[in-house]
Amino acid sequence: MAASETVRLRLQFDYPPPATPHCTVFWLLVDLNRCRVVTDLISLIRQRFGFSSGALLGLYLEGGLLPPAESARLVRDNDSLRVKLEDQGLPENLIVSNGGDSSFPCRKAKKRAFKLMEDEETDQGYKSLKKHCKRQEDSGQNEKASDLETKLLPDETGRTKSKKKSKVTGSPAEEDEEETKKKSSKRKEKCEPKKQTRASKSSKQQTPKEGASQNCSFPRASPRSLGKARRRSSTGLKGSSGHLSESESCPESVSDGHCSVMMQEVTFSEKLSAELLKDAPATKTAAANRQASKPGFTFSSGKGKASRTSSSSSDSSSESEDQFLVSKNMLEGASAGFLKPTGLFAGQGGSGPGLSLETPGIMGWKSSDSNRGRQAPGPPSTPVPTSLGRGWGRGEDLLFGKGLRGRGVRGRGRGRGQAVSCVFNRSSESQKQRQLNDILTNSSVVIQNPVEPPKKDYSLLPLLAAAPQVGEKIAFKLLELTSDYSPDVSDYKEGKILSHDPETQQVDIEVLSSLPALKEPGKFDLVYHNENGTEVVEYAVTQEKRITVLWRELIDPRLIIDSSGSISST
């Protein structure tokens, strides 16, 4: 057996170790026969001072690191070692060996490198796809721009010639103005094919009902006609804020066809609103009374139809413009109040009752023809809201029954409409009357406990000086622990003597009186666990029917006579 080579080491920690958090400097006695390499010494320090098995410790002797694979003989007696807790992510290739040359690369570094490679690949693929899409768009724009240039009117060609002449003869300031105008016209031409492609996509996605009203051929208008239409719309629409918002929401980048269609819709909606306002005073009170008596809903104004068609025809309008239109329509609805019930279906005529929740006749309605101003067939005299919240989605029901199918009132996006305020009056007169007739009563019920049987008066029984014969019944008291584990004299208990030893004065008694209900074991009760998983509880307060006590431990023993049934009870 080799002699033990023990060395005394002074360990200095940067921070207190977990096992002894109050100190950072320690002395350690190490047997070098058990520690072959520095790793063994590190594991010993890790075990002694409560570090986890995954903690990376570094040993430094006079400022130099002791390599983990080096021999532990580097350490001599009374050396001072600095123990430093290394970071987990610093060593990329951590060499952990026990005498051999096996190396284990860090898993986290591998995962990070793998993630970086994946991110680079996805970025490259995304960039190449983006470039491909841009090339296709540029080629399509160039083709459409060339087609548009061939379709220019002769007056525009004359204008361009005059511009060229003025460029040759004009001053430098005029040349700058002409250049800026040319740039703006080029931008418009570039934007037009984009808007056309987007409009065609939106028309393909719409249902056949909407396609009938929106797939009409848009006439190409010259810039002069567009300017005239804009002037007419601005002069004719000063009174109504909703129509002004429509004319303002048509940006210059929108194509000429779209703007001309909007002007036609504006004039049609003006005529419709004028007709409605003529008939409104006669039917306002009747519509308001029907609204209060029957559960239904009203729409804010018929002018929202124009804004709905304009928003569905041009997807290029931003969400902020949509919200601006919606707020204007809501203000109009609040000021105008309840309109005529036949506002949306002006072509049918007749004013019927409001739409109740039980009517199953609403199977759908078609949007109006925006160019010709005629109404599609629909349920007569039915007030329908221009939009419900964010639009009726695919197959969503209106008013809990079979409702309007399809994609609903379309706004920007798929299945989204304008959030126009709708008034739902769901409380009927019968419900109000039922609530008024409800009567609340306060009643108190007295719950009486059952009458307890009267206790026997054992004081009339004869006292016993010695134990009676076997088989006799006695009444006695015992010194027991109460429920709060304090010693106290119990009440009278009835028992039957089973055996009696005259020498030791031990008595076996069978308790005849009822025992208290078993409770969960307390802190003074002993619980024994068996091998089969069962538990045996030894209560501090005795819970057994048969007890063995000394006769002198019985307090106030009395003999129960057979005629004790006639004992008076208190």
Curated annotation (Swiss-Prot):
GO cellular-component term (any): nucleus
Principal location class: nucleus
Cysteines paired by S-S bonds: none
Residues bearing the modification Phosphothreonine: 122
Listed InterPro entries: Coilin, Coilin_N, Tudor_Coilin
Biased composition (Low complexity): 300-317
This protein's UniProt keywords: Isopeptide bond, Nucleus, Phosphoprotein, Repeat, Ubl conjugation
Entry coiled-coil feature ranges: none
Region called Required for interaction with SMN, residue ranges: 389-417
Sequence ranges of the Sequence repeats: 390-391, 394-395, 405-406, 407-408, 410-411, 412-413, 414-415, 416
This protein's domain notes: The atypical Tudor domain at the C-terminus contains two large unstructured loops, and does not bind methylated residues.
Family to which the UniProt record says this protein belongs: Belongs to the coilin family.
Stated name of the protein: Coilin
Lineage: Eukaryota, Metazoa, Chordata, Craniata, Vertebrata
